[in-house]
Each structure stands twice: as structure tokens, then as C-alpha cells.
Amino acid sequence: MLTDKKSSPTWSSLLPSETSQYFVFGNWKMNKTFSEAQTFLKDFVSCEILSNPKIITGIIPPFTLLSSCQQIIKNTPIRLGAQTLHEVDSGAFTGEISAPMLKDIGVDFVLIGHSERRHIFHEQNHSLAEKLLAAIRNGIVPVLCIGETLEEQEAGATQDILLEQLTVGLSRLPEHAPFILAYEPVWAIGTGKVANPDLVQEIHAFCRNVVKDLISKDAAERTPILYGGSVKADNTRALTLCPDVNGLLVGGASLSVESFLAIIQQIAVS
């Protein structure tokens, strides 16, 4: 079992070498055909801003595009992510994709428990803990996604929900294994509503304290926490000013080269 950050070159090359580095991951969800992805990346990879050492840029295409996207970005600073995986490494699980398959084609990181996986496909915290372990076992950095629904927020249950998601989701995490968190309030995803930056900072600080209590102070300090939920260029700067926001998980705005670059440019000048 992989338990040491130094044991995997994927981990050391993806995670920040300095605390000032900032993540921006574009989640394409179930969008783009092969030809559309090729057109996007041929325009995108030539952009000079992607060489900014303070920004770690990643794309998260559908499974069908991972290999072809990797061929285009393999000699660039862009990192490759997957949208989910199965918790078992191989077997009779028709339609599923395993961590060894993803690792073999050059995937650097994988989303675990995106809100659409939780709420549309009914993925539960315990199974997500197993998925996180599968990623770690195969040298892929897991991005554990957490967040509350509108009903839970209005009931004042946000912290209780996040505490449960973190406690169970990280329960199988090996000592010293690296991971990333992504806070994505369900009520802000694809709705055009973005959480108030002060609220985002408060929640990210809460999550960091939970990691400190569950694992260690060192883990809390080195774990990047991203924000996701209707991220666009016009709200990026305010989010980057939050001290506990270490990056952004971008959805719809990552489907266009122009809008994705506009976000990256806002990060660069922040």
C-alpha cells in the first residue's frame, strides 16, 4: 500500500511545491466529442499563461477522451484528471473504470464524490472512502468533493454534513497519503449562484480544522482545498483572496477556451 508522498512521482509533480501555487481544474462532465476536445486543446495548449509556475491547471474530460487528451497535453504543464473510478482494481463490473486503467494512461488525479455522483447516482460516503483508497493505492491523487444541499444549508446543517462527509470519506486514508478537498455547495453548481466569499472562507477554514482533528496539523496545512460552484471570471478574484481557498473546480466555464482562460488570467493577476 502506498503511504508515503515520496513513493509516487505523480503525487510530487501534481501537488504544490510551494504554498503560493494555485489550482484550477476544469471539469468537462459529460461534454465534448473527440473532435471537439481536439479543437479545444489545440487552441488551449498554446496559451503562454499555462506556463505560469504559480498556477497548476488541470482538465477533467469524460473517460472516452482521456487517452487522446493525454497525447496532446503530455509535454505541457496541464494535468489530466478523471471524473470518478471504481473502488475495485479489476473484475466483473461492467461499465466501470478502475484506478490501474486510469494510471496506465497518465491520469494524475481523480474526483471522488462529485455532487452529481452523490445525488444522481446515489454514491455514499462509505463507498467513496473505498474509492479514495483505490486512488491512493494506485498513485493517483484523489480530490474528495464535499458539499451541502440548499435544504441542508437552510436548516443550518452545513457543518454537520461536511463533518460527516470528511470523517467517513477520509476514514481509510493511509498515513501521509496526499489528497485534495473540493468544497462545492450543491445549491451553487450550475445555478449561476456563487457562495459569498466570506462564507466560502469560513467553510474552508472549518474543513481545514476538521482535517487537523482527523489526521494532523501537517495534513491540514499541506492539503489544498478548492472551491467549486458557478465559478466564472467575474467572481474568481474575490475567491482567490480567501486565504483558505487554494484553487477552483470549474464546471461550465471550462468548456470554452475563452472563458476558462479568463478565469486563469484572473488568478494570475491576483
Swiss-Prot record:
The keyword Cytoplasm appears for this protein: yes
Predominant location category: cytoplasm
Keyword annotations: Cytoplasm, Gluconeogenesis, Glycolysis, Isomerase
Single GO cellular component term: cytosol
Pfam families in alphabetical order: TIM
Pathway: Carbohydrate biosynthesis; gluconeogenesis; Carbohydrate degradation; glycolysis; D-glyceraldehyde 3-phosphate from glycerone phosphate: step 1/1
InterPro entries found in the cross-reference section: Aldolase_TIM (IPR013785), TIM_sf (IPR035990), TrioseP_Isoase_bac/euk (IPR022896), Triosephosphate_isomerase (IPR000652), Triosephosphate_isomerase_AS (IPR020861)
Entry EC number(s): 5.3.1.1
Catalytic activity, reaction form: D-glyceraldehyde 3-phosphate = dihydroxyacetone phosphate
GO BP terms: gluconeogenesis; glyceraldehyde-3-phosphate biosynthetic process; glycerol catabolic process; glycolytic process
GO MF: triose-phosphate isomerase activity
Active site: 114 (electrophile), 184 (proton acceptor)
Highest taxon, organism lineage: Bacteria
Class of this enzyme: isomerase
Binding site for substrate: 27-29, 190, 230, 251-252
Compartments (UniProt record): Cytoplasm
Family the UniProt entry places it in: Belongs to the triosephosphate isomerase family.
Subunit relationships: Homodimer.
Role according to the record: Involved in the gluconeogenesis. Catalyzes stereospecifically the conversion of dihydroxyacetone phosphate (DHAP) to D-glyceraldehyde-3-phosphate (G3P).
Protein name listed in UniProt: Triosephosphate isomerase
Species in which this protein is naturally found: Chlamydia muridarum (strain MoPn / Nigg)
